[in-house]
From Swiss-Prot:
InterPro entries: Mtfr1. Belongs to the MTFR1 family. Residues 168-296 are annotated as: Necessary and sufficient to promote mitochondrial fission. Residues 101-121, 154-193 are annotated as: Disordered. The keyword Manganese does not apply. Residues 154-164 have a biased composition (Low complexity). Keywords: Coiled coil, Mitochondrion, Transit peptide. It comes from Danio rerio (Zebrafish). This is Mitochondrial fission regulator 1. Residues 165-189 have a biased composition (Pro residues). Disulfide bonds: none annotated.
Length: 318
């Protein structure tokens, strides 16, 4: 291998003056070097000592990371931009390969992050179920102990009521533990509920009302007070008639009608005042006659009417 490397170096050294290699071999290559093209991906080889062989890579003591001492050459084209003009030949051993493709993550593999929550939820559910089962077991144990105490107390009470003759004294009975509460009554079956329809309910209610009415009718009735609404209900149909009193006219004296006119009242007052004088004069002369004011028929004036209106000075239009 060392001889081949020496031959390659000699060939490169000899051909450096004539420039019959690389980009100076033809016009096409010269034009291509002047074009701003991106370089193709290249393969880099790392040289290791031949004595160590493949065991050098697998040895735990040796460094597996490449260093500058292990690299034979460094490709400087990666750091250069695409606009670099390649005027000189690249040094080193170069092999053209395909472009490097980024590694894709395989989605078919199960992800640990998605599996962990499901396992945690299953463990939580299992813990809750175990706790419920343990609570039920403790309740069953308590009920069994209570039942055993009740049975034992009943047996002891039976033995104390009928003691054997000449036998040992019976120990005092233990205080009985209160029995557990009775279970709730069973719910009626749906078939019974369906048969008990609304028609039956109506019939039962009517029967109850009829029984109540019969009980009320059989009970002694109290004297009820007359209702005024019933008394006054037919008052509009009653017709009234005038009744004259049959009394003798001789026994009853007609009352003098008092005058309502002011002039008549004054004349009546004067007549009463000077009645004794008129009597004396009439006895002496016998010819004097008192002319009393004639009673004019009194006309009642209405309270409201045209007499209350004030005159405006206009003529009445006929």
């Amino acid at each position: 291998m060392s001889r081949n490397h020496r031959r390659i170096e000699m060939d490169l050294a000899v051909g450096s003056s004539s420039k019959h290699y690389g980009s100076s071999r033809s016009i096409v290559r010269r034009i291509a070097t002047n074009l701003p093209l991106a370089p193709c991906p290249r393969v880099h080889f790392q040289l290791h000592p031949f004595a160590s062989g493949a065991s050098f890579l697998n040895s735990p003591n040796g460094p597996n990371v490449a260093t500058l001492a292990d690299v034979a050459w460094i490709d400087r084209e990666e750091s250069d931009g695409p606009g670099r003009i390649r005027c000189e030949a690249d040094s080193g051993l170069v092999f053209r390969t395909q472009e490097r493709r980024p590694l894709r993550r395989q989605r078919s593999l199960p992800s640990l992050h998605q599996v962990e929550p499901a396992q945690q939820s299953q463990t939580v559910i299992n813990d809750e179920a175990i706790q419920k089962i343990s609570v039920l077991e403790t309740e069953l144990a308590k009920l069994r102990a209570q039942i055993a105490q009740i049975v034992q107390a009943q047996e002891q009470s039976a033995q104390s009521t009928a003691p054997a003759p000449g036998g040992p004294p019976v120990p005092p009975p233990m205080v009985p533990v209160p029995p557990p509460p009775p279970p709730p009554p069973p719910c009626p079956t749906p078939s019974m509920q369906r048969s008990y329809s609304a028609i039956d309910l109506i019939r039962e209610r009517r029967g109850k009302k009829a029984e109540q009415n019969t009980v009320l009718d059989s009970a002694p009735k109290k004297p009820e007070l007359p209702n005024m609404l019933d008394v006054l209900k037919d008052m509009g149909k009653v017709k009234l008639r005038s009744v004259k009193s049959h009394q003798e006219d001789g026994n009853v004296k007609a009352k003098p009608v008092e005058p309502t006119d002011a002039a008549a009242m004054i004349a009546e007052a004067l007549k009463r005042k000077f009645a004794h004088r008129y009597r004396n004069d009439s006895e002496c002369d016998g010819t004097f006659t008192f002319t009393a004011f004639e009673n004019k028929p009194h006309v009642e004036t209405p309270l409201f009417g045209q007499h209350m209106l004030k005159s405006t000075g206009r003529r009445k239009m006929h």
